[in-house]
Amino acid sequence: VYRNFLEMQNLNDLHYKKLKEMNFTDDYIKENQFKSIENNKNKKKEICMKLQEQGLKLDGIPGFFQDTDFKWTYKSHKGIFIPVTLNNKIQGLRILLDNEYRLDTENIWFSSNNEYNGTKASNWPMILKDNTVNWIDMYNSDNSTSIIIATEMILAHKLFNNTNKTVIGIPNNIDKDLILSIVQRMNASEVFLYADKYTILHTSTLMYENTVKSLERQNIKVEFRVALNENDIGSELKENEKNIKIA
């Protein structure tokens, strides 16, 4: 549903310029389906109707809901859709907002749980990897590796774009269990944990400490880094690449 839905969205000049300022190439933008959100009321319903004509069901899909006329539509936001991909499937859509939301966050889920027949989004992780890396091999490797985790999807894309290393993106509320699950599944011995501005300002210090301590109890080294100059983020990993094996 999401893949076809994104094909019906466009990318406006303002958002294109914003993405280019983040050092994303045209090919990267197209390949990852970064799109502006269509907010015209009639066009939204036309898009939903086209999806249904393709045989796709919208009930149970986060972000979609039925309007007062019982026609399907979706939640309106001003921003850019960031697809959250896991195992070759778009599990959900994260939104990079034009204007900051509550508590100064620029990132929210495409969700419709408070609407009629709407659905709440789950806290999905995202894995960005080179096309030559096989999903099964990545999860079942016996070799111990270092992995990169970023506490927001757009930050994960910046890291992947700058390093071409496997990057795991997670929502910016630092889900300890989610991080532990990913690290164990990928047999990681070292974690480079990058935090965005919102996470630093609004996430409990205790939550950070619990996450780091849980990893260290399993003899996993943690390199905690704050993403200050986000557009150049990850450059230090390139400099140290000879000394560390990053997935």
Which residues make up each language-model segment?
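TOPRIM fold recognition
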Residues: 91, 103, 144-147, 153-247
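Short, exposed beta-strand "edge-strand" segments with a Pro/Gly-rich flavor and a Y/T-containing core
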Residues: 18-24, 34, 115-137, 227-239
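Non-catalytic accessory segments of DNA primases and related replication-initiation nucleases
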Residues: 1-67, 198-199, 209
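Phosphate-handling DNA/RNA-contact segment within nucleic-acid enzymes
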Residues: 43-187
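A residue-level signal for conserved active-site and pocket-lining positions in enzyme catalytic cores
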Residues: 19, 88, 193
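A generic structural signal for short, non-catalytic loop/turn and secondary-structure boundary residues
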Residues: 24, 29, 75, 142, ...
